[in-house]
């Protein structure tokens, strides 16, 4: 691709976001570039004492319909779309008395921001830009002749290009690609919003008839789950882990991100101060504490200190200096929190490789998706919000009602077991997990694993949670033999009566929630 620089002699500017406009206009004026502009943009440039041609003067047609029609005119679009490499195009421009543009600077109405503000339907519709995307797409298509700029972040590039004889062909192509991404993102945002409005009015489904997402490459990662797999991080429009601020440590890996996401979600499932330690997307330990976040960390780590080695730690509260000192004694891949007490980052940074992240709370609403071959599965996020997640709605199926203290442990266990890959059994005591059985293909093995991880002493007197019903009594019997005092489970098995009978026989209290928390 040749250099083929196009000197900028004429520019069209129409921007909602006026950031950097003053410097841009002054730079163009210094190089004697003719400026054509619209509405408030033209007024702003004129206020600077810079000559500017209002677009209505160019077209001979007034702005109308409350500004809905400004630039939709042949004298504008012919000047943008003329391919100046073609003699026929140049001849037609001369006949039509239209001068070509070499630079188009446009940014669009703030549709996404208007929607986010909670504006009503009509107000959002008014912020759907028509003329702006038309000019951007036209200029991007004609990038062999025109440079298109859609972000104030590119204004310095414009100023540099003015000094070097214009943008090169390669630079114009890059700007065109950015412009098409810009309008595509805008259109996806509008289409998604409109589809969601229709879905909200449709009593048959809460899901939109069309889903579109846009994500931008943030950076390439060293590799994927395994060294032979290439990988990259793309970021979306919502804030979250992908936009986390990193204070220290090596670059995040693919596996670091997946484990951090699991840990972050697990910690924020709990309203009380909570620490979750995750390895391979499963909990090594989770604990809550009203005493301190450091206490929560101690108890979470104590659940399985062997597996916690090289794990990911997430806290839903500020990391204190006390907690930082504890973490600094343990090999940890990542620690993530909403904030850090003064001095905590410095303590953690004494460990060369630990990745220290600060992130906003995870999204606690909406839908999540998963790719399958040929399609996409979409579901409502599991936010521990089912009717059966409220202990007030639990059914006492066996034994006697437990004390408030034991009930708190059952509530904690029920919330924590959501973070465990199915089949999941979790043992808890005093607001902390003491044994976790995860990812087994039958519930008996998960129960055995949880008991084995806890050990006889910690299992005795603990409570248990099962993410789904016991299909037979054998899984429950493993827990009863280990000395648990109470268990919470969804119920719903055709053999519920056998399981409940086993609980009564063992003297174990059993609550049924009617809600399930599979995690695959």
Curated annotation (Swiss-Prot):
SMART domains: AICARFT_IMPCHas (SM00798), MGS (SM00851)
Domain MGS-like: 1-150
EC numbers: 2.1.2.3, 3.5.4.10
GO MF entries: IMP cyclohydrolase activity; phosphoribosylaminoimidazolecarboxamide formyltransferase activity
Keywords tagged on the record: Hydrolase, Multifunctional enzyme, Purine biosynthesis, Transferase
Family matches, as Gene3D superfamilies: 3.40.140.20, Methylglyoxal synthase-like domain
UniProt cross-references to PANTHER family, sorted A to Z: BIFUNCTIONAL PURINE BIOSYNTHESIS PROTEIN ATIC, BIFUNCTIONAL PURINE BIOSYNTHESIS PROTEIN PURH
SUPFAM superfamilies according to UniProt: Cytidine deaminase-like, Methylglyoxal synthase-like
Family under the similarity heading: Belongs to the PurH family.
Record note on domains: The IMP cyclohydrolase activity resides in the N-terminal region.
Pathway: Purine metabolism; IMP biosynthesis via de novo pathway; 5-formamido-1-(5-phospho-D-ribosyl)imidazole-4-carboxamide from 5-amino-1-(5-phospho-D-ribosyl)imidazole-4-carboxamide (10-formyl THF route): step 1/1; Purine metabolism; IMP biosynthesis via de novo pathway; IMP from 5-formamido-1-(5-phospho-D-ribosyl)imidazole-4-carboxamide: step 1/1
Xref: InterPro entries: AICAR_Tfase_dup_dom_sf, Cytidine_deaminase-like, MGS-like_dom, MGS-like_dom_sf, PurH-like
Reactions it catalyzes: (6R)-10-formyltetrahydrofolate + 5-amino-1-(5-phospho-beta-D-ribosyl)imidazole-4-carboxamide = 5-formamido-1-(5-phospho-D-ribosyl)imidazole-4-carboxamide + (6S)-5,6,7,8-tetrahydrofolate; IMP + H2O = 5-formamido-1-(5-phospho-D-ribosyl)imidazole-4-carboxamide
GO BP: 'de novo' IMP biosynthetic process
This protein's GO CC annotations: cytosol
Name of the protein described by the UniProt record: Bifunctional purine biosynthesis protein PurH
């Amino acid at each position: 691709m040749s250099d083929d620089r196009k000197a900028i002699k004429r520019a069209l500017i129409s921007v909602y976001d006026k950031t950097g406009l003053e410097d841009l206009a002054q730079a163009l004026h210094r190089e004697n570039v003719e400026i054509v502009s619209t509405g408030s943009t033209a007024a702003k440039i004129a206020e600077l004492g810079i000559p500017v041609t209002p677009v209505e003067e160019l077209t001979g047609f007034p702005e109308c319909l409350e500004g809905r029609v400004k630039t939709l005119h042949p004298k504008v679009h012919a000047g943008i779309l003329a391919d100046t490499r073609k003699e026929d195009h140049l001849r037609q421009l001369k006949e039509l008395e239209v001068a070509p543009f070499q630079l188009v600077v446009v940014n669009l109405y703030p549709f996404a921001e208007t929607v986010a503000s909670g504006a009503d339907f009509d107000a959002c519709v008014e912020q759907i830009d028509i003329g702006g995307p038309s000019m951007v797409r036209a200029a991007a298509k004609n990038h062999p002749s025109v440079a298109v700029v859609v972000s104030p972040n590119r204004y310095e590039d414009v100023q540099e290009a003015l000094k070097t004889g214009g943008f090169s062909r390669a630079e114009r192509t890059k700007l065109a690609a950015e412009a098409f991404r810009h309008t595509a993102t805008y259109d996806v945002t509008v289409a998604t919003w409109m589809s969601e409005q229709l879905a909200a009015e449709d009593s048959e489904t809460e899901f939109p008839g069309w889903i579109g997402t846009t994500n931008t490459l943030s950076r390439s990662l060293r590799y994927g789950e395994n060294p032979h797999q290439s990988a990259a991080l793309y970021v979306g429009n919502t804030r979250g882990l992908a936009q986390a601020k990193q204070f220290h440590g090596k670059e995040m890996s693919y596996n670091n991100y997946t484990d951090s996401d699991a840990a972050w979600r697990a910690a924020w499932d709990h309203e009380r101060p909570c620490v979750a330690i995750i390895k391979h997307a499963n909990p090594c330990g989770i604990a809550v504490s009203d005493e301190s976040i450091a206490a929560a960390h101690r108890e979470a780590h104590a659940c399985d200190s062997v597996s916690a080695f090289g794990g990911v730690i997430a806290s839903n509260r500020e990391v204190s200096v006390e907690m930082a000192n504890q973490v600094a004694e343990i090999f940890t891949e990542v620690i993530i929190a909403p904030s850090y007490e003064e001095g905590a980052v410095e303590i953690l940074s004494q460990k060369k490789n630990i990745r220290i992240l600060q992130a906003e709370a995870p999204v606690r609403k909406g839908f999540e998706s998963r790719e399958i071959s040929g399609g996409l599965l979409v579901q409502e996020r599991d936010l521990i919000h089912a009717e059966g997640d409220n202990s007030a709605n639990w059914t006492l199926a066996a034994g006697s009602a437990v004390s408030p203290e034991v009930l708190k442990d059952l509530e904690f266990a029920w919330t924590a077991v959501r973070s465990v890959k199915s089949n999941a059994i979790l043992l808890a005591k005093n607001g902390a997990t003491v044994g976790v059985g995860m990812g087994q293909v039958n519930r008996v093995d998960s129960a055995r694993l949880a008991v084995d991880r806890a050990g006889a002493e910690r299992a005795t007197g603990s409570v248990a949670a099962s993410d789904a019903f016991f299909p037979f009594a054998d899984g429950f019997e493993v827990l009863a033999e280990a000395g648990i005092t109470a268990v919470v489970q969804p119920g719903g098995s055709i053999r519920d009566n056998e399981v409940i009978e086993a609980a009564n026989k063992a003297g174990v209290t059993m609550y049924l929630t009617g809600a399930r928390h599979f995690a695959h």
